[in-house]
Amino acid sequence: MSVIFNASVNTKSAVEYQTISSTQSHSAEEQSERLHKWISKDQLEKLYSSFLNTPERHVGIDELRIILEELDITFNDSMYTRLFLKINQNRDFKVDWNEFVSYLIFGFQEEDPSSQKESLILPISGPPMVRKSEHRSAICCLALLKAKSDQVPIDEVTETINFSFGGEDSPEASGMWVTASHEGMMRFWTSHMEPIRTASSESICMSYAFFNNGKVHSKLILGDYAGNVRVLSYSPHLRGPFQAKPGAALIEVVWSDILRGKIPQFFPKEYINLHNEMVSCVYFSLHMNALFASAEYRNTKKYRGRCPGMIMVTYDERSNFRIPLGVSTFFVAESHNIVVTGGPDTFVRIWDVYIPTEPSAILTGHNGGIVLVFVQPEENKVYSVDYQKIIKVWDLHEHTLLQTYGDLVRLIHHSETDLTYYYHSHLRELVVAGRKLISIKCCPRVRVDLTDGNTHAAPVSVVLYNRLFRNIVSCGLDSYIIVWDPWTGRRKIIMKSCHTKMIYGEIIDIEITAACFDPLEQFLLTGARDGSLKIWNYNNAVVVRNMSIMPDQEVTAVIWVVDRILAMGWDRQVTEFNDVVGREYGDPKKWPKFHTDDITCADVKLGEGVVTATYSGEIIFWKLETGQPYRRYSVMDPTRFIELKLTAEEEKFIRQSKRLASRLTHSGNHSLQTGRAGRSTVLNRPEDNRDYGTDIPISVQAVLFLQTRPQTLKHGSVFISLDTGFIQVYSHHQRGGYIVEFLAVHKTGDCVLTMCTDRKNRYLYTGTAFGYIKVWYIVNFCVPESEKTHVCMPKLRLEFIFLRKELFMTRAKRAVRNQAEPLLVSSYKGHLKAINSIAFINLPKIIFTGSHDYSCRLWTQGGRYLGTLGTVLPWSRLTPFERAGDDNHLYRMPPDIKKVASSTTLKVISGIQAETSIKISNGKTVEDREEETAQTEDVTELRKLLDKPVKEPIVGKHFELPGRSILDQHIELDTTQSYIAVFTQLKVHSTEMLERLPTPAVVSRVQTENYMDHYIPVEGKVDVSGSAINIKQPSRRRSDKASDTRNVNTLGARDHVPLDFSSSHASQS
C-alpha cells in the first residue's frame, strides 16, 4: 500500500511514500541509511559548491538527485524518496545546505556511545536500609573484610558489565562488614546488615592493598599523627608471616624489630615527615605502584595556601597536589588514571595523576567540608558526601550535577556529625555508620536472573514504529520520549521532561498519554495528561509547536491526517488544529459536542471517517472531511438506534452564541467582535456535573479501524474492545451497524486494552490487562461469503506452535472452543502487568509491546521472545529486510515470566512442545515399547553373566501389590467453567458418630477435687527497722482433714526451711 502526497502547489514533482519491498538490495539500502559514512571529504566540498551555485541556495527533490548522481551517489526511486524525506525537516520539499549537513551530523550523533550511558533513573533512587548499630557508643571505624580485592591485574581487566546473575551478596563474594566503637567493641555483619558475632579489640585505621592471585606482594599502609607514612610489604603465599606456629597463639612485635629484620617475611619502608600534619587518608595503587597520602592543613596563616594536600610517591619521586586547606579524603580510579579529592574547602577536584599542577575539573555546590568521595568508573559517576550529610552525584566526563540526595539529614539526628562512611564497590552500596547503620544503593546493577531490565522509569504508555527512519519510539508516564534502534537494541535519543507544569514554583513532569506520527512520519505528536500537545522533531529533540485542548483535561487520543490534527480526551469533544503553513497558529476548531462522557479512545479511516468512544460506552462515527456525526451506538445495546442529539450544555451554548451573534449583527465591527465573544464564551462555559445514577456503564477500552476493508454493510471494519473482555465488530457504513462480538480473553476480569493489525489486515494483535498477547486470524471474519478464502491449517501450525495438539485442552483454547471465527492462533503471557500499547512491523514480522511494568518487549509473530529494549544483555541481531526468528534457534524466556508461565506460555515462547504419548498401530504407546526394549536388553545381559538360568522366584517371597479392579472407572471432568474444581471429583464418605466411653472413677474424683482444701496461706509482716523480712508462723487452721499425714509432713517441712533473705535484699539494694 502506498500513499502519495503532493510536494507543494507550485511544484510538479510528487513524493511517493511506501514501505520497503523484500526485493530491494540490502547493501544499497544500508548505503542510504549510512550516508554520513559513505560520503567523502572531496564529495562534500563539491556538494557545497553545488548548493552555492543554485539560484536560491536550495534545491528540490529532482535537483538534489541530479547533484548526487554527478558524484556517483545513486539510489533507486524508493530509497531516494526515503532519503529526501529524512533530509527535508522543514517539510517545504526544498533542501538547503544546512538541512543536508544536519542530516549527516545526526547520523554521527546516533553512533555516539555516550548516549547509551545516560540513565533513565537517578543514581540513588531506592530507599535506604536503616538498622541499629548494637554498640553502646557511636561507631568510630567502619571497614570491610574483603573476600576479593578491588584491584585486578591489568592483564586480567575485562570490560565491566552493568548486570549480575545474583549471589554476589553472599559472604564468600562480598565479604563482611566490621564496625568498631570507642569502648573497644567490634561487631561483624553480613552484607545485608545482619549481625554475625562480636569481639573486643582496639580500634585502628589502616589501608590494605592486595591482588586475588597472590603473585604480587600485599601492602599494608600506616599513617600517624606526625605525618609519617609506613609501608609494610609481604608475600601472601601460604599466609605469609601470619602462619600459625605451635605454642604461640599471639605474636607481638614492635616496629623497630621489623626494621631490624627480625621477621624476614616483612619488607618495611618508611616515609618520614611526608606531611607536616596528621595523615588523613592513605592508599597504595598496585597498578601504578604508587603511594597516595593526604593531610588537612587548616592553619591558613601558617601555610598560606601553599600546602601539599596530597602527595603521590612513585619510585622515590614525589608529586605534590597543592590544595588550600588540604585534603580530607580522596579516591583513585586506576582505569581512568584520575584521582578525585575533597577537603574542608567544600570543593571536589578531579586530577590527572600525571598532571599534579592543575586539576582537570572543580565541582562546586557543597555547603560543607567534604568527608567522602568515590567514583564508579563503569558508570562515569562521582559521588561526594559533605559534613552536613548531603550526597551529590556528578557526571565524570561532563562535570555536571546529576542528583542531590538529602535523606540522610532526615534519618540521622542533627547533633550526630562524626559519622563513618564506606563504599562497597562490589555491591555498589554506601554504608553510613553512627548510632545507626544505613545502607544506600548507588546505581545498583540489574539482576538478570530476575528481570531483563526496564525501558522507561515509569509505565510505558505508547509505542510506535517509524517506517521512514526504521526505529521505535516509546513514550512513558515518566514524561520521556526515547528513540530505539530495534535492529541493534541501541538507544538513539532520549528526551526527558517533555511535558512539564509549574506548581508552587516547582517544575513537575506530566505523563504522556497519547502519541502519533505525521502522514510522512517526519514529526512526532504527543499529548499529555494536562491537555497539552507538542509537535517534536525527535531527531534533534526540538519542539516545533505547542498546542492545548481544554486545560487539565487528559488527552487520550491524537490523529494526524493531511493538513489537520485531531485531539480528543476528557473534554468530551474533538478539537481540530490546522497543519497548513501560515494558518497553524489560529484558533482550533471544536467539533460538535455529542458525547456525554469522557472520550477514552479514537481511530481514523483515511479519507472516510473517524470513530470515537467514551467511558460510558457511547460510540459515534464522524465524517472526516466535514466533522459531522452520522451514526451513534451504545455498546450495552448495540442494535438499538440512538438519535444524534446535542447535549443540553451544547444546545445552551449554541443558543447563546446565536443570540449574541444576532445582537452583534447590527453593530459595525461584526466579524471582530463575534470572534472575541466566541472565544470568551468558550473559556467561560460551565462544567458538566451530571449524575450517572447507580448503573455502572460498560466502558470502551480501544477501537481499531481496518484500513483495507471497504465501507459496505457486510464488511466488519471497526473493532470495539470492551472492559468485559468482549470485542464488538461494527460496519462504519451509514446504514451499517453492529455485526457480531467475540470473547477475546480467557481469564475472568481481563480485557483488551490495545489492538493493532498488519498491513493487509490478516491478523489481529491484542494486548490485555493481565499481560497476555493474543493473535487472531481475521481473513474470513466478518466478510461476505464470496470473499472468504481457504485456510491452510498445516501452514498456520508451522508458524504458530499454539495450534498444535496437546494431551489436554488448555485454558486459552477452552475459552474459544465454541467460537468458529475469528481463529485464535497464538496466546501467551508477555508481561506481568497490563499491556498499554502494541504495534507490528510488517516485513520482519515483529510484534512489540509497551507495558505497565516499565518495559517494551519484542516478539516474533509466532510468539518467540526477541528481547527487551534497554536491556543490559547482548542483543540478537535483527534486520528490517528479513523475517525475524529462526526455528533452529533456542529461544530464551523473560526471567519474570518464567516464574509464572503456564504450559501454554512455556510452549509458545520457547518454541518447544512437550512430548506426549502417541498411539501406534499395535495398541501400545511409545513409552511402553521403549520399556519392553529396555527389559529385553537387561535379560540378555543377565544371560551373559550367568551360565544357567536362575530359578524362580528370584527375589524370594515378597509383598505383591493387589491387581487392579476389572471395572474401569471413567472420570468426566466438568469443563463448562473457566476452571475445573478438583474437589467436585472426590468421593466423600459419610462419617458416623463415635461411641463415647465412660469416664473412669479416678478421673471423676480428680475433677471434683478443690485445690483450696490443700492450700495453707502464709501471713507475713515487714520489720521496718531491720534489713530482713520477718515471716511469722500462722496459727493452725482447723480442718476436717487436719489428721491427714500428707498435711503433717508438709507443715513439718515448712518449719525447717530457713527464712533468711538478708543477703538477697542487700544485693538488690
From Swiss-Prot:
SUPFAM superfamilies: EF-hand (SSF47473), Quinoprotein alcohol dehydrogenase-like (SSF50998), WD40 repeat-like (SSF50978)
Highest taxon, organism lineage: Eukaryota
Keyword Repeat in record: yes
UniProt KW Repeat keyword: yes
Pfam family, any one: WD40
Tissue expression per record: Strongly expressed in testis and weakly in the soma.
Region described as Disordered: 664-688, 1033-1069
InterPro entries: EF-hand-dom_pair, Quinoprotein_ADH-like_sf, WD-EF-hand_domain, WD40/YVTN_repeat-like_dom_sf, WD40_repeat_dom_sf, WD40_rpt
SMART domains: WD40 (SM00320)
WD repeats: 155-199, 322-361, 365-404, 455-494, 507-546, 594-634, 747-786, 830-869
Keywords, in A-Z order: Repeat, WD repeat
Start-end of Polar residues biased regions: 664-674
Additional record remark: Chromosome mapping suggests that WDY is fully contained in the kl-1 region, and WDY may correspond to this fertility factor.
Record protein name field: WD repeat-containing protein on Y chromosome
Origin species: Drosophila melanogaster
Taxonomic classification: Eukaryota, Metazoa, Ecdysozoa, Arthropoda, Hexapoda
